[in-house]
Amino acid sequence: MARIAGVDLPRDKRIVVALTYIYGIGDATAKKICADAGVSEDIRSKDLTPEDQEKLRAEVDKYRVEGDLRREVSMNIKRLVDIGSYRGIRHRRGLPVRGQNTKNNARTRKGTKRNR
């Protein structure tokens, strides 16, 4: 089982799909990583040679992924909350941040309805 960026990649999936299991790598980035590393997108994770794994690790290390990315996102949200911006207040209150209406919807962010 290939282990890249602290994530065990699924064995039976194509490498371009398996790379998307790493937080911060989507479809387009996975394809770019495979192209830059010179690894075929159609090869399965279990069929990777150790050399291919090293090439992929080197390419993934160029990106901000997993713990570093999660930390950066949480620090960005913390900064908004600390400066008291509108977006920070919405984060603190658990309401939608990007301007969605909340009169009828936004149940996911607001939680279940409380009895009146």
Swiss-Prot record:
Record keyword Ribonucleoprotein present: yes
Record's compositionally biased regions (Basic residues): 106-116
Region listing for Disordered, in residue ranges: 92-116
Keyword vocabulary terms for this entry: Ribonucleoprotein, Ribosomal protein, RNA-binding, rRNA-binding, tRNA-binding
Pfam family, one: Ribosomal_S13
GO cellular component labels: cytosol; small ribosomal subunit
Functional summary from the UniProt entry: Located at the top of the head of the 30S subunit, it contacts several helices of the 16S rRNA. In the 70S ribosome it contacts the 23S rRNA (bridge B1a) and protein L5 of the 50S subunit (bridge B1b), connecting the 2 subunits; these bridges are implicated in subunit movement. Contacts the tRNAs in the A and P-sites.
Family: Belongs to the universal ribosomal protein uS13 family.
Quaternary structure note: Part of the 30S ribosomal subunit. Forms a loose heterodimer with protein S19. Forms two bridges to the 50S subunit in the 70S ribosome.
Full protein name: Small ribosomal subunit protein uS13
